[in-house]
Amino acid sequence: TFAPSLSREILRLLPGGRFELNTRLLDFHLARAGYFVEEFIRLFGPQRRPHDDITQRHRDLAASAQLVLEDTLLHVGRRLRALTQATSLCLAGGVAYNCVANGRLRAELGFDHVYVPPAAGDSGAALGAALWWTARRAKATVRVVLPDAYLGPQYDEPAYRAALSEAGLVAEYLPDDRLYERVASELANGRLVFWYQGRMEWGPRALGNRSLLADPRREDMR
């Protein structure tokens, strides 16, 4: 396991719900470009290239990073819960998309509700800025509840047919019961299925209206 090294060298927990990130070893912008300092490579091994096999070391490193992330969020959340006694928690930022960590926050810290907006990252800042400015100008007369994330465009069947024709694709039209059977069969045979219906989701997560489906039981689909 790499968790002890990550906790000691990269992400240290401090008293009072605080933490410290060692940017000398882990630079976000350099890492995105594929550059790591020698000390980081010494601790965790060489970088995996896109076409390299995924080894047990890679799996262990990913699992350890997930565990350290969860422990850090619990560390911060525990302090927040003690200070506020709040029973509801709202999260934002890219880390808020980590479903496993969110589940632990709710299960282990006593929050009754954990809310993550569908566009919790940078893209959601546009709507947040608009709402903040509206409230600041005292123009917000109604508090609108966001029932779901399906705020994007929606198209009718003539538009579907026109798009398929323009792309030179031949379509087969099936009733719902036969469609579901066909999709299940294709998934079981290791095929990818693009599921398209209704309005497009707002945010980076595919939530069933613009989704690529695959059988998670298959090793070659992971």
Residue map of PLM features:
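Flexible beta->alpha loop and helix N-cap segments adjacent to enzyme active/binding sites
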Residues: T1-Q56, R78, A82, A86-S88, ...
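Adenine-nucleotide phosphate-binding core of ATP-dependent small-molecule kinases
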Residues: P50-V76
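Active-site glycine-centered loops adjacent to acidic/histidine catalytic or metal-binding residues
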Residues: G94
